[in-house]
A protein has these predicted regions:
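Conserved small/polar residues in nucleotide/adenosyl-binding loops
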Residues: 225-230
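Helix-terminus/linker motif at the lipid-water interface of multi-pass membrane proteins
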Residues: 40-73, 91-92, 129-138
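Hydrophobic faces of transmembrane alpha-helices in multi-pass small-molecule transporters and flippases
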Residues: 1, 17-48, 73-77, 81, ...
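Small-residue-rich hydrophobic transmembrane alpha-helices
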Residues: 63-125, 158-177
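Alpha-helical transmembrane segments of multi-pass membrane transporters
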Residues: 1-3, 119-123, 179-203, 216-224
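Residue-level recognition of pore/gate-forming positions within transmembrane alpha-helices
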Residues: 69-72, 185-186, 211-214
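Short membrane-interface helical motifs at transmembrane helix boundaries
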Residues: 118-141, 145
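Alpha-helical transmembrane segments of multi-pass membrane proteins
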Residues: 26, 70-74, 138-161, 190
């Protein structure tokens, strides 16, 4: 309805059906297929995480589910700004503003960081209030607090890491983004299997994988940008 009311159909060629351009479709798939695999792998590792937590016991699984619920809520602004970065980087490159891409990424990352600092401050200052939304059991609330603090640290790093990482896909280099994600997720999977199934560490220690994951994602993304900048100068 919005498209019909607001968009100029003739300007964008929407006023008539066009033949399927298989060459264009192939080019789109050659870029998007890496993104599809990337998202699939990211979701699959969460499955592995909860398998490892389940081996620790039902109590630990309950803690993980509660903390994960808060984690997902905190991810909303981060994911929103990361997706925005992807779109704006693509638009800026299309407009010929390649020289301004890094400045744009930095500005969005800074905004994301400060928003997350506020969110984390609320969570850290009022952990029981946040957790009580999901359970009224006092003992479970107390046991969930350490894991919540770990996630709070992870989200501060994620606020910057996700912006820089999603900007890579915005440049069209989805293959590089997939390689970075795969490398990080391999470490993620091995770490959680070891710490959860072999060491059988507490839930809060298991959640430390999120800190490691986002740190590696940020580091690898920055290294890629540094490498590309060096290649451009050469």
């Amino acid at each position: 309805i919005y498209t019909y009311a607001k968009v100029d159909f003739k300007k964008f060629g929407l006023n008539h059906w066009q033949k399927i351009d298989f060459s264009l479709l192939g080019r789109i798939l050659s870029i998007s297929c890496f993104t599809m695999v990337q998202y699939f792998l990211a979701m699959a590792t969460w499955f592995v995480f909860f398998i490892a937590i389940e081996r620790l016991g039902q109590r630990e699984l309950a803690i993980a589910n509660i903390v994960r619920s808060i984690y997902i809520v905190m991810l909303i602004p981060v994911q929103a700004l990361s997706t925005t970065t992807n779109s704006l980087v693509s638009n800026l490159i299309g407009a010929g503003g390649i020289a301004h891409v890094m400045r744009l990424i930095w500005r969005i990352a800074r905004m994301s960081f400060f928003i997350m600092i506020v969110c984390v401050a609320i969570v850290v200052l009022f952990p029981h209030a946040m957790l009580s939304v999901y359970t009224n059991e006092q003992a479970l609330l107390v046991e969930s607090v350490p894991s919540l603090y770990v996630i709070a640290v992870a989200m501060v790093i994620a606020s910057v890491a996700n912006v820089y990482f999603n900007a890579i896909s915005g440049t069209g280099n989805t293959q590089a983004a997939l390689i970075l994600e795969m490398g990080t997720l391999v470490f993620y999977t091995l770490y959680i299997l070891w710490i959860g199934m072999v060491v059988k560490a507490p839930v809060s220690v298991c959640f430390s994988i999120e800190v490691v994951y986002y740190s590696l994602l940020l580091l690898s993304s920055c290294l890629l940008y540094t490498s590309d900048a060096a290649d451009d100068k050469a």
